[in-house]
């Protein structure tokens, strides 16, 4: 059987939406090439500027943002977009009122890993433009994740893979590095991805343990207690500091990812951006049979109150996510840790 290419696959979907995905995929292919050539082209290191969140930008952050923005500017169906790198909405100069769709994106997730050559990626989501006929505004983006019509990411690692859902399962396309010239040839390499329901892997930044809520403390301690603890089996812990890399591992072999609420800044409920990080990944998880929550409710039900609204994120294999939700529902059941004291890596919380 001949391989199925992205262009052929998109032909079965609404033409306008397919065209949006086509433009995003082209931008991802350009970013992939730029990332691969970054050490040779002098594109490593800081850009000497800050993004909309006040975070230092890498040179590749700026380049990736330009790649996606240029691609969306050329798409007649996109009214406007929001990028992690900019505080406000960018209205399409040509199609700001007539475009049927809005796009949100993180142009280069995990960019702090660039110089160590760890996998990085681009995350995107497509929303309907509910106020079509008027220029795209911030209010138009205040939609729950359930309204997404497409979401995905590209991961730039040993191979470049575009992971995509248009609401009918999750599919993976690999970029052909031998395609002639500047052509971007994406080939379907995995269709209808399903995340295993159970897992023995979890991913969390353990250095923040002292700030976690008790339900998360309990969950991690039980995992670390291993076979002799209440779970009766051993777990492995992972942490890459790249949301794309963490999610890709979960889609490939299962697992659970936690970036929970913590007490460092009580006025901020989480660390990941809802529109262009949490919601797209939650959409992919649910499309692949997994689950995604804040700990107290489904991520896809949340309506952002700002373009860069941040939330806690727990996603992955359904059994583990549901267990963590149960722990949040009854904090009084988060029992003493003395049972695990000799096995835990963590200092026991004081009463």
From Swiss-Prot:
Hydrolase keyword on record: yes
Residues annotated as binding substrate: 109-112, 205
Cofactors required: Mg(2+)
Residues holding Mg(2+) 1: 84, 106, 108
Enzyme Commission number: 3.1.3.11
Family matches, as Pfam families: FBPase (PF00316), FBPase_C (PF18913)
Assembly and interaction partners: Homotetramer.
Family from the record: Belongs to the FBPase class 1 family.
Protein name, entry field: Fructose-1,6-bisphosphatase class 1 1
